[in-house]
Amino acid sequence: MMIVLVTNGPVPYRIPALNRLAALPGIELHVIFCCRREPNRHWDLPPIEFACTYLRERIIRIGDRYIHNNPDVLPALRRLAPDVVITSGFNPTHLYAFAYAWLHQVPHIVMTDGTYDSERTLSLLHRMVRRLVFARSAAFVWASLGGQKLFASYGIAAARCFRACLCVENTRFAERPGASEPPFDFIFCGRIEPVKNPGFAFDVALATAARLRRKVRILYVGDGSEQARIEERAARHGDAVEASFHGFASQQDLPPLYRSARIFLFPTSWDPWGVVANEACAAGLPVLVSPHAGAANELVVDGENGFVCDLDVQAWAARAELLLSQPGTYAAFSERSLSLVRGFTFDTASDGIMAACRHAAALRRQ
């Protein structure tokens, strides 16, 4: 079976699952990338072990969004003659690929990291496009329960939907024997931009220090436009909070950084999932997360391995105080993080994509 996936660009949390898919007997996987890297992405990538094509980059920027318009996807598809076409978005390039599949009677699969909540504000036109594509697609792949809810909202039967979770290499983040006490109380990992609320994380550290009546330490991993403002605040409140800024970290540097802290703060205003939560859980950290992350109430379960809280500083600080002052509670939450994240693996993700492809191919034979 020749499977062609058309997607924006290579991302570290999907490549290992695609490598596994490509290694399956009887499977030829070819991934068509719209670009080598979107301008706001700074991650490093694991080895790519599948065939791929990089289209000539044609990117339109609208605010923080990047729109891909690559007509050369059509000759690439004609050359590959796929048995199944998967698209992971609704940029013009993805729609060209969908049109190819429909016109050539090739089964089409919709794959999304999006959620019901992340798409609630879409325009009527965007919804109409989705209805058109969904009505002519054979199978659907979701990354989170929010994605499952999204497909259900369009009336798509559960039997046509398959899970391909977002994940990391869990074993890389596991605690090493003989590890010392983590020097940081908190870690914030991600782009230091307003949508991620890094300043809120500092406010939580400050309020927690007041509750514990001691100085707390927070580590920022990442970079962005908000860093200077937080550094200025940290200088003013140095008696209560010690803030350290690591800057951008490569994938290989991340595990010890997570293990250097006790609690992961994830106060995002918008994240369809949030792979940083996988990384934190794999390192055994309890997670405080806003309800605006797709991982909330799925990977991070309120009261089990963390807390899902609205963006209220004192509410977050109260929960942080509980974890930092109750060793038994902390240990239980830490162990539960390790347990929950075991269900999020690259093998599981690969199996979900393969199941969707088999379902789509079976429909073609009918």
PLM region spans:
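Aromatic "clamp/platform" in nucleotide-sugar-dependent glycosyltransferases that forms part
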Residues: 269
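Nucleotide-activated donor-binding/catalytic signature segment of Leloir-type glycosyltransferases, i.e.
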Residues: 231-249
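Conserved donor-binding/catalytic core segment of Leloir-type glycosyltransferases
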Residues: 4, 178-206, 219
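Short alpha-helical donor nucleotide-sugar binding micro-motif in glycosyltransferases
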Residues: 248-249, 256-261
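Short hydrophobic beta-strand element within catalytic cores of glycosyltransferases
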Residues: 286-290, 300
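A short, histidine- and acid-enriched strand-loop-helix "catalytic/donor-clamping" loop
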Residues: 106-124, 136-139
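Conserved acidic donor-binding segment of nucleotide-sugar-dependent glycosyltransferases
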Residues: 301-314, 322-327
